[in-house]
Amino acid sequence: MTFTNKDLKNMIIPLFFEQLLVMLVGIIDTFIVSFVGESAVSGVSLVNSFNTVFIYLFTALASGGAVVISQYIGRKENEDTNRASGQLLMFSIIFSLALMILVLIFNESLLRLLFGRVENSVMQACITYLKISAYSYPALAIYNAGAALYRSMAKTSTTMYISIASNIINCIGNCIGVFVLHAGVAGVAYPSLIARVFSAIVITFLCFNKTLTTYYEKKHILVFDAKMLKRVLNIAVPNGIEQGIFQLVKVALSSVVALFGTYQIAANGVAQSIWSLAALVGVTMGPVFITVIGQCMGAEDIDSAHYYFKKLMKITIIFSVIWNVFILLITPLLLQYYQLSSETKNLVFILVIIHNLFNTIAFPFSGPLSNGLRATGDVKYTMIVSILSTVVVRGILSIIFGITFNLGVIGIALAMCADWSMRAIVFHLRYKSDKWTQFSVIE
């Protein structure tokens, strides 16, 4: 398998700008929602934290499909790529519809179980927003399935353009819903639903294009292919379990952060928004590893897989250094727009320094490299390591550093970095061991 520098650039740059766009639009959305009132902001924020679990599940499912599709593309078995794509779409629809129905039925019960202590106005905002956003689950899952197909073919510019159009629809819709129709929380929820439906329709239409290397065929969508579906789920389920437990630990740690006082909670919240921006390189490179390494393994070209593991790691590290230094340099400028005390701003800057340092030296090995290992079929090992590291290292050290050593949110950040470092060491050793070469995703 051969990927030229131009091929890699054409994959990486659109993915990076797509993720950056999503991040910036998220900030704009929060700004627009703030005009509805504090209850709306709180309600949307709480529901988004709940919806994140489902987003990760749909992403895990799509990633499983991407690994299988990439390997079949590498082996040049076009009919099997179409079978895998069709089964991914079929299961994504069924799975997301089931979740949508469950959330619509148990909407209020779930919210009161999770956020029962919030004020009534916030709870009503939560109920309204969740009911509307639940209808977008199938659209989100369908889009992820189609995006996985296009990314497996290294056609990332397509998903970038769809994302641009979708986010423009979302922003304009939010402005109309909030400032023209004065629809409150619903004025923010419906544009998101419309934007996701738009993305799902466009990507699905494009995926039926028979001139593509792999494409949707009705005969593969309207049938239950147990063997092919099993191959997809063998990758998706461990990844979904890993991401689910990771989210649960994050929720648990948010209750620990709540013990540290107002200024530390505020600093942690602002720092996390900057961390998300700094983490874009790792988020971008994950799908690139899946596509490239997946195709190499499908072609049974172990030498090329070794070569691109090393090349992509070099790109990730260099890109991470440049981006994280840039974010660190502009952090003081960003902090000028926050109405925070000097003490809080100083704490934010310390947290960003800690994060960006380890995001450069450890996360490339704990994040993108692990996606490469998953693309070879080495999913159970990465799942077990990630779960143990998340629970034991991040969870326990957060309590020790944050509470016992009285380091507060700095302790939480150090525990997070220790988690990354542990995974980085173990995954690097796993790569060096060559055990990942022994796995088989497709027959």
Listing of model-derived features with the role each one plays in the protein:
Residues 1-15, 69-136, 180-237, 293-358, ...:
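Short alpha-helical transmembrane segments in multi-pass integral membrane proteins
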Residues 38-49, 126, 130, 189, ...:
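Small-residue hotspots at the loop-to-helix junctions and early N-terminal turns
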Residues 10-29, 132, 143, 166, ...:
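Transmembrane helical elements of multi-pass membrane transporters/channels
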Residues 24-42, 111-120, 176-183, 244-277, ...:
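Helix-terminus/linker motif at the lipid-water interface of multi-pass membrane proteins
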Residues 3-31, 35-36, 52-64, 96-100, ...:
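N-terminal transmembrane alpha-helices
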Residues 19-23, 56, 96, 100, ...:
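Residue-level hotspots within the lipid-embedded alpha helices of multi-pass solute transporters
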Residues 62, 132-151, 159-170, 188-203, ...:
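Short runs within selected transmembrane alpha-helices of multi-pass transporters and secretion channels
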Residues 41-101, 140-159, 254, 265-331, ...:
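Small-residue-rich hydrophobic transmembrane alpha-helices
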